[in-house]
Swiss-Prot record:
This is Alanine--tRNA ligase. Its cofactor is Zn(2+). Binds 1 zinc ion per subunit. It comes from Cenarchaeum symbiosum (strain A). PROSITE patterns: AA_TRNA_LIGASE_II_ALA. The gene is alaS.
Length: 894
């Protein structure tokens, strides 16, 4: 269903879709834009829509409001207005969208209240009507941030939401309120307000919308979500929704008339950055340039071309652009990106190379580069403090995350600094080749090497950032599509009664509702199905072994080993209680460890994934670095402290909205919960999580938790492998036995070393006398010595150690070059062979060793003067000695 098709249909009947009470009462006239043809409503008889009018962005330097409001002041006055008009002011939701698995970040205020149920999106509002200052993150236009004067990576969407009836309202009241906000609350002349007809469509629903502008600046868009289905065959929704989203930054901008929206929205941060540059934020030159950039970007669509045109029209030279405008643009970008990072990290996101963390790391690297280039004297922590101090009045929760934000930014900045040398070498090669990289190569350079386009611009490798670069990156790291649901073989079956959420009997009888090669469906079951990282129960059904249990919507499918059951029959079912107990302990241990890790490491720790089996489990957490031994010890100690305190573990059921309001979004550790009633597992005074798994009644039942291994499995994710209960006790027993074995081995090693040292000492004492005896024509105890025509020959077999033989042999041939020496002795599981041959002996040490080692089933090598080898067949020791005699003394092997 194309948006333009819907717009044509709706615009053909404005009375039905767009005409509201205000237009009739105030005399708004409907016109078609003389330039683009869009329909709009205005009081001043203008011929063109706001985006094509001559007064577009003329508020810069000449605001239409009698009073200026900065970011914080603008929210206070808007909140006051809506509360006075019957709305409940709701605190912002996290920017990390924990309640939707198809979004990493909150991109609009209406997302706060959307919950996915199967293939449908439902709305759950905590009040009707309400207003919310929702911080939203969007990354498709990062290259525009700091450049256009109006693009942000994070912005506050003022969400005005209502449902007709029960205190809510519909189109007439909505537009009355929005018009009243502009004209009566902010004092903007009514002739300045223009409404433009538009439509919205998404998630199978659609409806008309009215965008409202003042001097070409779109301030808000009131969407009336009214229909579902396909145009022409659509029906009216049972529950119509008012979804008005307005930009808080733009409200501040329209009332202050500053050259950019950044100047009035970042409080003291912009003042500090501008002071560092020595820049004048209120200069006529800036106002002229940014007025034109905003207009030209809308008309030509290319950022780089819009900048060139705007500089030319404002009379700004290239040198002035490079020396004044560009550095100020970097200041705007730095202020914006740091604010975004503060919100994201405060809400539990981490910069990384995967998923939503990718954009955060990209922004941080842009900030790091700009700080180094343009603001070398400024401290990042100072800017964080200035931001949080300014925002605390609107978002008090940021103050509690101040140190965590600084910690993460410091770690990431340090990593960026460490990688600069490598980045410099890669960039130099690109520069030397004389050909600028295209968009695909730029994406690869950032993906593989962390090199940002801004870094390449600074190095002279490229001239400008391609307009599509950041949107391409954003697309590459969008959330993956949902997996397909189960096949049609289970269609039409009634949901299985899940006994494991009630009395949970270990033995029960059930009726077979479906039986096939794919498995068995019962009318009721106590077998827990695989889900949430918990492995399934095993046992028997009708005497057949249960090997797997899976959940398909509300249907539980059991897989059996070696048999089938008749549909309609009643069967006896027995669950493996030992397996269930082990898995249950590990599941509660997962909750304990997750909360303990967060307490030890920092607020950014969330469960990334988990796996719970009978005798082992693992927990993957979001963390920036590998864990040290000290950190592991602290986490384990904290977890076992909770176990020893024997805290109660309780389970309660709550409407999803109430659970979120009561416990916060920390409950979504295991991911999205696609049900309207949430099962909350509470470890008293320690942890609350939405969870469908099995748990012990108190933490003392876990017994013991031992972390067996940790490793970093991907950027920003650390795995903790652990055991609990009997498995932990067995692990301790095994570890103790291993430690005892290691201790015994060390003692044996020490004794062996002592023996070696004693042997060496003895060798030092006896070698001189033995050498004197042999070189004097005598013999030595335990050695065979003979003198022939070629010189003296010595054979030592089965005596002394390697130290003795190497020392003795080397000295012997040095004293008597006509001598040859061979030693054969046991060393552990092998038999060693050493040979020395003096320069005048006529013997070859290598030949002796090679042949003797072969007898032992081994090999050897070396030179004529010295060689060594051996073999493992100690039973051939006598044969080896006999072969050595032949080689040394002649004769045969007898």
């Amino acid at each position: 269903m194309e948006k333009q098709e819907i717009l044509r249909e709706f615009s053909s009947d404005p009375e039905k879709y767009y005409t509201v009470r205000l237009f009739r009462e105030e005399g708004f006239e409907r016109r078609a834009c003389s330039v683009c043809g869009r329909y709009f409503w205005a009081l001043d008889g203008r011929p063109a829509c706001p985006e094509d009018s001559d007064d577009t962005y003329s508020f810069i330097g000449d605001p239409p409001a009698p009073r200026a409001y900065d970011y914080a002041q603008a929210w206070r006055t808007i909140e006051e207005y809506f509360v006075k008009n019957g709305h409940e002011s709701v605190p912002r939701y996290p920017v990390v969208c924990r309640w939707r698995d198809d979004l990493y970040f909150t991109i609009a205020s209406i997302v706060d209240f959307q919950r996915v149920m199967g293939s449908s999106v439902v709305f759950e509002f905590p009040a009707n009507p309400l207003v919310v200052p929702q911080t939203c993150l969007r990354f498709k236009d990062l290259e525009n941030v700091g450049v256009t004067g109006r693009h942000f990576s994070s912005f506050c969407m003022i969400g005005q939401h209502a449902v007709p009836g029960n205190g809510g309202y519909w189109k007439d009241e909505c537009i009355d309120l929005d018009y009243g906000l502009l004209v009566r609350q902010l004092g903007i002349p009514k002739e300045e307000v223009v409404f433009v007809e538009d439509v919205w469509a998404g998630g199978g629903s659609f409806g008309p919308s009215l965008e409202y502008y003042v001097r070409g600046l779109e301030l808000g868009n009131a969407v009336f979500t009214e229909f579902q289905g396909e145009l022409g065959n659509h029906t009216t929704l049972d529950r119509r929704i008012i979804d008005m989203g307005a930009g808080l930054e733009r409200f501040a901008w329209i009332t202050t008339g500053t050259p950019t929206a950044y100047d009035c929205c970042f409080g003291p941060v912009m003042g500090r950055l501008a002071e560092s540059l020595g820049a004048d934020q209120d200069s006529a030159e800036l106002a002229a340039y940014y007025t034109r950039v905003a207009v030209n970007l809308g008309r030509c669509g290319d950022l780089n071309e819009a900048r060139r045109r705007s500089a030319q029209e404002a009379g700004i030279s290239d040198s002035r652009m490079a020396g004044a405008i560009a550095p100020l643009g970097e200041a705007y970008m730095v202020a914006d990106h740091i604010r975004t990072l503060i919100f994201a990290i405060s809400d539990g996101a981490l910069p990384s190379n995967v998923g939503g963390g990718y954009n955060l790391r990209m922004m941080l690297r842009r900030v790091a580069g700009a700080m180094e280039r343009t603001f070398p004297g400024l401290d990042l922590d100072e800017l964080v403090d200035l931001h949080i101090d300014y925002l605390m009045g609107t978002y008090p929760e940021l103050d509690g995350a101040r140190q965590d934000v600084k910690t993460i930014l410091d770690i990431e900045a340090s990593r960026y600094g460490d990688s600069k040398e490598r980045m410099g070498k890669i960039t130099a090669k690109i520069t030397d080749r004389g050909r600028a990289p295209g968009v695909d190569e730029l994406v690869t350079l950032y993906e593989s090497d962390g090199i940002t386009p801004e870094y390449l611009i600074e190095a002279g490798a490229i001239q400008e950032v391609p307009p599509e670069f950041y949107s391409r990156l954003d697309e590459l790291h969008a959330p993956p599509p949902k997996a397909a649901g189960p096949g049609p073989e289970l269609a039409g079956l009634a949901d299985t009664e899940m006994l494991f959420y009630g009395e949970d009997p270990p033995e029960f009888e059930a009726r077979v509702m479906h039986s096939s090669d794919g498995g068995v469906v019962l009318d009721r079951t106590s077998f827990y199905a695989r889900g949430g990282g918990q492995e399934p129960d095993h046992g028997t059904i009708g005497g057949f072994r249960v090997t797997d249990v899976s959940k398909h919507g509300g249907i539980i499918l059991h897989r059996l080993d070696g048999g089938s059951l008749a549909e309609g029959s009643t069967v006896r079912c027995i669950r493996d209680e030992k397996r269930r107990a082990g898995i249950t302990r590990n599941h509660t241990s997962t909750h304990i460890l997750n909360a303990s890790a967060r307490g030890v490491l920092g607020s950014w720790v969330w469960q990334h994934s988990a796996f719970k089996e009978e005798d082992h489990a693992r927990l993957d957490i979001t963390h920036h670095s590998p864990l040290s031994a000290a950190e592991v010890k602290k986490i384990e100690a904290a977890a076992n402290g909770i176990v020893k305190e024997d805290r109660g573990v309780s389970i309660g059921y709550h409407p999803r909205g109430e659970a979120e309001q009561k416990y916060g979004f920390r409950i979504y550790q295991g991911g999205v919960v696609p049900v309207s009633t949430v099962r909350i597992v509470t470890i008293k005074g320690y942890d609350d999580e939405a969870c469908g798994g099995t748990h012990v009644k108190s933490t003392g039942e876990v017994g013991l938790i031992r972390i067996t291994r940790t490793k970093r499995i991907q950027d920003g994710v650390v795995r903790l492998e652990f055991v609990s209960g009997d498995a932990a006790i067995e692990h301790e027993r095994t570890a103790a036995a291993r430690a005892e074995g290691d201790r015994a081995a060390e003692e044996a090693k020490g004794r062996l070393q002592e023996e070696r040292d004693a042997g060496r000492l003895k060798s030092r004492e006896i070698i001189p006398g033995m050498l004197e005896e042999i070189t004097g024509g005598g013999s030595a105890e335990g050695m065979e010595v003979a003198t022939g025509p070629g010189g003296r020959r010595c054979l030592a077999a089965g005596i002394h150690d390697e130290y003795f033989h190497t020392s003795f042999g080397k000295k012997l041939v040095a004293m008597d070059p006509a001598c040859a020496y061979c030693a054969i002795f046991e060393a552990g599981p092998t038999v060693r062979v050493l040979a020395y041959a003096g320069s005048k002996s006529g013997a070859g040490a290598d030949e002796i060793v090679r042949e003797v080692s072969a007898v032992l089933g081994g090999s050897g090598g070396g030179a004529a003067g010295f060689a060594q080898g051996g073999g493992k067949d100690s039973s051939k020791m006598a044969e080896a000695v006999a072969r050595a005699r032949v080689l040394l003394f002649g004769g045969d092997n007898t």
